[in-house]
Amino acid sequence: MIDEILFEAEEHMNTSVERTRDELVNIRTGRANPAMFNGVIADYYGVPTPITQMATISVPEARMLLIKPYEMSMMNEIENAIRNSDLGVNPTNDGQVLRVTIPQLTEERRRDMAKLAKSKGEDGKIAIRNVRRKGMDQLKKIQKDGDAGEDEVQAAEKELDKVTAKYVAQVDEVVAKKEAELMEV
C-alpha cells in the first residue's frame, strides 16, 4: 500500500517535470527549433491536425526552418496556421517549401522570455508539491486507519520528501538550462 502511494507520487512528479520541459520547449530562444511548431494546428481536409504531421521540418541554418508539406495542396493551410499562431514568425512561400526565419530576440524580449521560463518552472514545482501533499495525506490516512505503523509511515514520508526534492531539482535544472539558452546571444 505504501509502495503504491510512493510509486504513484513519483510517476505524477515525473509527469510534471515532463510537462514543464514540454512547455519550455515552446518558448522561443532566437534559434531555429522544429519543436516550436508542435502546438501549431492546421486544417487538413476539415480535421484539425498538427503541422508536424503534415510536413517535414528541417533546420538548414541556425535561424531558419524549412517546412516541406507532404501534400503541396496543404501549403497555404500550413502557412496560414503558422501566421495565425502566437509564435511571432512570418513564413515565406516559394511554391515548394515554406521558409521561416527566426528573428533575433532583443535583450528586453530575452528577459521577458526568461521570466516566462521561471514562471513555467514555478508552476511545475507547485504541481510536484501538490503531488507530495496528496501523498502525505494518503500516508496519514493509512496510519489513521491502522493499515500501517507509525515508523513505516515516517520512513515513507522521508522517502516522499527525497523524491520531491529530486524532482524539484530537475525542474530547477531544466529552467536554468532554458534561461542560459535564452540569454545566450
From Swiss-Prot:
It comes from the Bacteria. It is found in: Cytoplasm. This is Ribosome-recycling factor. Responsible for the release of ribosomes from messenger RNA at the termination of protein biosynthesis. May increase the efficiency of translation by recycling ribosomes from one round of translation to another. Keywords: Cytoplasm, Protein biosynthesis. CDD domains: RRF (cd00520). GO terms for molecular function: ribosomal large subunit binding.
